[in-house]
From Swiss-Prot:
Native species: Rattus norvegicus
Note: This protein appears to have acquired a second function as a laminin receptor specifically in the vertebrate lineage. It is thought that in vertebrates 37/67 kDa laminin receptor acquired a dual function during evolution. It developed from the ribosomal protein SA, playing an essential role in the protein biosynthesis lacking any laminin binding activity, to a cell surface receptor with laminin binding activity.
Annotated GO MF terms: DNA binding; laminin binding; laminin receptor activity; ribosome binding; structural constituent of ribosome; structural molecule activity
Segments annotated as [DE]-W-[ST] repeats: 230-232, 247-249, 266-268, 275-277, 293-295
Gene Ontology process terms (BP): antiviral innate immune response; cell-cell adhesion; cytoplasmic translation; epithelial cell differentiation; ribosomal small subunit assembly
Protein's UniProt name: Small ribosomal subunit protein uS2
Length: 295
């Protein structure tokens, strides 16, 4: 498919990307029309996809996309969430029309509805999940390109790109590769220099994982600010005037306070106290008389 040109041959770095993303790993089931793209079967039943055939079909799909004069006439679709971000990134890079999420039935056939479109080329992520746009494309003679796994049905698919269309990394990498080849064939970017866009931007990320990472980053930033604040706080300045003393043993004068003298008395020389036993007796008699009078 590359025509024997060295410039179109698959590079070693591309093979490493495919292997890292698991693009060569298919499923345990095999469709009879996908047998031509299979390299081998593992002992655990997983089929290995021939990456050479994947690269050839990728170049063929890129040539078909470049052949469309108006980039907006190319519709790229992904109903599964693993390919929605990749579809939007591909559309932003190449100028295609994305449909991420649920495909409204009748978009290609019902002229009454507001979402009616007449594209010239259709690219889908999964023929099984995106069966509705493929079926409608067959009604309006629309050529189709699809990322196909080992068990994907090839009905209504004109150009099948064999790859792992289940994994988020594999799907993102395939859309990134397709966008890069389209831009290279258009002459937008050079083949001599690597594309500055990273494949990570095409990968699907779980919203819960993104939220957890944001919370962890926020907590780390707050902790860092508190730590820096403790060490960077200015030291308090003491403005109280300190007495200048040359010799500390002689400089400080302690005022002498006279000790107050209290007169001492001889407690044994005091007169004897009265007889305490007589007074209570008299009082008691008076109280008895008073009580007698009451009775």
């Amino acid at each position: 498919m590359s025509g024997g040109l060295d410039v179109l041959q698959m590079k070693e770095e591309d093979v490493l990307k495919f292997l890292a993303a698991g693009t060569h790993l298919g499923g345990t089931n095999l469709d009879f029309q996908m047998e031509q793209y299979i390299y081998k079967r593992k002992s655990d039943g997983i089929y290995i996809i021939n990456l050479k055939r994947t690269w050839e079909k990728l170049l063929l799909a890129a040539r078909a996309i470049v052949a469309i004069e108006n980039p907006a006439d190319v519709s790229v679709i992904s109903s599964r969430n693993t390919g929605q971000r990749a579809v939007l990134k591909f559309a932003a890079a190449t100028g295609a029309t994305p449909i991420a999420g649920r495909f409204t039935p009748g978009t290609f056939t019902n002229q009454i509805q507001a979402a009616f479109r007449e594209p010239r080329l259709l690219v889908v992520t999964d023929p099984r999940a995106d069966h509705q746009p493929l079926t409608e494309a067959s009604y309006v003679n629309l050529p189709t390109i699809a990322l196909c796994n080992t068990d994907s049905p090839l009905r209504y698919v004109d150009i099948a790109i064999p790859c792992n269309n289940k994994g988020a990394h594999s799907v993102g990498l395939m859309w990134w590769m397709l966008a890069r080849e389209v831009l290279r064939m258009r002459g937008t970017i050079s083949r001599e220099h690597p594309w500055e866009v990273m494949p990570d931007l095409y990968f699907y990320r779980d919203p819960e994982e993104i939220e957890k990472e944001e919370q962890a980053a926020a907590e780390k930033a707050v902790t860092k600010e508190e730590f820096q604040g403790e060490w960077t706080a200015p030291a308090p300045e003491f403005t109280a005037a300190q007495p200048e003393v040359a010799d500390w043993s002689e400089g400080v004068q302690v005022p002498s306070v006279p000790i107050q003298q209290f007169p001492t008395e001889d407690w044994s020389a005091q007169p004897a106290t009265e007889d305490w036993s007589a007074a209570p007796t008299a009082q008691a008699t008076e109280w008895v008389g008073a009580t007698t009078e009451w009775s």
